[in-house]
């Protein structure tokens, strides 16, 4: 379990999550996520932090992130896998989520168990609380479809965990990694064919392709 210094945990968070992860197969690398309330000190609760719950790699890669590490708990088998990583990484929660979607197993409990403090100093930035808000797509036009930092982390992940990945996982990751080399039309075909999604939406990625730079 990771903890961030500026969040406020409910009294039952640790006990609830510990009991939940104990019910999973200890031999299978597993991670369990709960939700959180987004909390602004000057406003109060503005919504929930986690708006999508990806369980496969196709729905994770274009998020350019993972669910907050402070909302997770993982077993010893997952810990051993994470320790195989060598060198810098985009974010620890990104690695954890990649492993859960490929090598291990992910569990979700859509239950808020903490206040996720939203302010300008958050490492992951200010959290939007409406995934269907058109502003989340059209705002910050300079932001790319794919964050280079996370792209590089996926590339490194593919190499480090090659022996643990099934062939179908390798194929999907390789398709994602090759996208910067393809034309706009080829990108569209690849995204649709492989069912890449962002917030459970293929079309969301396609819209971004026309509005934003692909990677930087």
Which stretches of residues belong to each language-model region?
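Nucleotide-sugar donor-binding/catalytic module of glycosyltransferases
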Residues: 1-129, 206-215
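C-terminal subregions of glycosyltransferases and related glycan-biosynthesis enzymes
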Residues: 89, 117-216
């Amino acid at each position: 379990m990771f903890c961030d210094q500026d969040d406020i945990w409910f009294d039952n968070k640790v006990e609830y999550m510990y009991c939940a992860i104990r019910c999973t197969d200890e031999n299978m690398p597993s991670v369990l996520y709960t939700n959180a309330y987004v909390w602004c000190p000057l406003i109060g609760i503005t919504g929930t932090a986690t708006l999508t719950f990806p369980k496969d790699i196709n729905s994770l890669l274009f998020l350019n992130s993972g669910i907050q590490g402070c909302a997770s708990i993982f077993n010893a088998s997952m810990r051993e896998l994470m320790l195989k990583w060598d060198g810098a990484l985009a974010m620890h929660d990104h690695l954890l989520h990649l492993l859960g979607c490929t090598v291990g197993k992910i569990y979700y409990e859509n239950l808020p168990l903490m206040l996720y403090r939203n302010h300008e100093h958050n490492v992951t930035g200010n959290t939007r609380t409406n995934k269907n808000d058109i502003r989340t797509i059209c705002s910050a036009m300079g932001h790319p479809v794919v964050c280079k930092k996370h792209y590089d982390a996926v590339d490194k992940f593919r190499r480090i965990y090659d022996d643990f990945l099934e062939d179908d996982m390798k194929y999907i990751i390789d398709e994602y990694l090759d996208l910067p080399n393809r034309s706009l039309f080829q990108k569209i075909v690849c995204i649709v064919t492989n069912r890449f999604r962002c917030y459970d939406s293929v079309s969301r990625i396609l819209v971004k392709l026309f509005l934003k730079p692909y990677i930087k």
